[in-house]
Amino acid sequence: MTDRIPMTPEGYEKLKEELDRLIKIERPAIIKAIAEARAHGDLSENAEYHAAREKQSFIEGRIQELQAKLARAYVIDPSKINQNKVAFGAKVRVIDIDTEEEKEFHLVGPDEADVKNGKISITSPVGKALIGKEVGEQVTIKAPAKTFNYEIISISFE
């Protein structure tokens, strides 16, 4: 898979920190735990050994996943983007035309999306609808349960 992954500087650093923690702290700790469990004798009935090996497998898989994501990542600096239009990295404040409720969305790459914290993927229906729009423009987003009508009230890049 050679697709490049757009990422904010913050998202890239977060993945890098997790990778460093796994390599420098978690991996050595699990190797030590396996060695200690191995010292307890018969491995066929050694629950500690099997649990440690399972955890090691998970850690190694996550390390490979993070290395692949970071290798494909390209960091987009929001300060170098046209600030007048919604683009990757933008924080967009909208008002729901029907309910007059204000919401804020932070447009990020798919690997950084966290809906509970207002971070939505640029590939999501909301992200796709907002990209390229300007303050004052209205967008309609058709979700499975409901249609949302938003007006963009501000765009910022931090």
Swiss-Prot record:
Residues 47-73 form a coiled coil. The keyword Transcription regulation applies. Keywords: Coiled coil, DNA-binding, Transcription, Transcription regulation. Pfam families: GreA_GreB (PF01272), GreA_GreB_N (PF03449). GO terms for molecular function: DNA binding; RNA polymerase binding. SUPFAM superfamilies: FKBP-like (SSF54534), GreA transcript cleavage protein, N-terminal domain (SSF46557). One of its GO terms (biological process) is regulation of DNA-templated transcription elongation. This is Transcription elongation factor GreA. PANTHER family: TRANSCRIPTION ELONGATION FACTOR GREA.
